[in-house]
Design a protein with these regions (language model features):
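S-adenosylmethionine
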Residues: 1-174
Length: 174
């Protein structure tokens, strides 16, 4: 555990030295836990793409991979797991932090009667764009980012995810 590892350090070290503004916290925040969290590797969250839930879970179980089911479309695995050696990344599941996946709750409330125009204006790795396509299905997708290299990587990820129809451009929206 982390507490034993910290004991191996110089006795003058305190985990509270990591974030010295504890007196600025709102009431109810555990200062010790907050500081210790900087030393804990977070889980890797996978958003399971529609129709792939059982397939991904079966593959993980066959490899005896420990995972936690967060909800019907999200599972958490160890961050050290080389997930791309077990599943078809971007086709069966997308690596996407849990907080970003919450956008899906809002998208799921939208009626799918029309073709929606979706602009992911700071696309980065495109996780929310892929989620919009999964939830809203037939969309007119536009993606932009300030970095051309990011859009190049995004093109590869979209190809893996089966997204062929979209527009992209470089833009600084600051």
């Amino acid at each position: 555990p982390l507490s034993k590892k910290i004991l191996l350090l110089d006795s003058s070290f305190s985990v509270n030295d990591i974030f010295p503004w504890g007196n600025e916290f709102s009431e109810g925040i555990d200062y010790e836990k907050f500081c210790a969290a900087f030393f804990i590797q977070p889980d890797l969250f996978l958003r399971l793409r529609p129709g792939n839930q059982e397939r991904v879970i079966t593959k993980l179980r066959q490899q005896e991979i420990v995972f936690e089911t967060i909800n019907e479309s999200c599972i958490a695995v160890a961050n050290s797991l080389k997930v791309d050696t077990i599943i078809e990344l971007n086709k069966e599941a997308v690596i996407q932090d849990y907080s970003s996946q919450q956008v899906g709750k809002l998208l799921a409330q939208v009626k799918k009667e029309n073709v929606f125009r979706v602009w992911d204006c700071c696309a980065a790795s495109g996780g929310k764009s892929i989620m919009a396509k999964d939830i809203l299905e037939d969309i007119d997708l536009t993606v932009s980012d300030i970095r051309e290299s990011i859009l190049y990587n995004l093109k590869q990820r979209f190809a893996e995810a089966g997204i062929k129809q979209y527009k992209s451009f470089v833009a600084d929206l600051t």
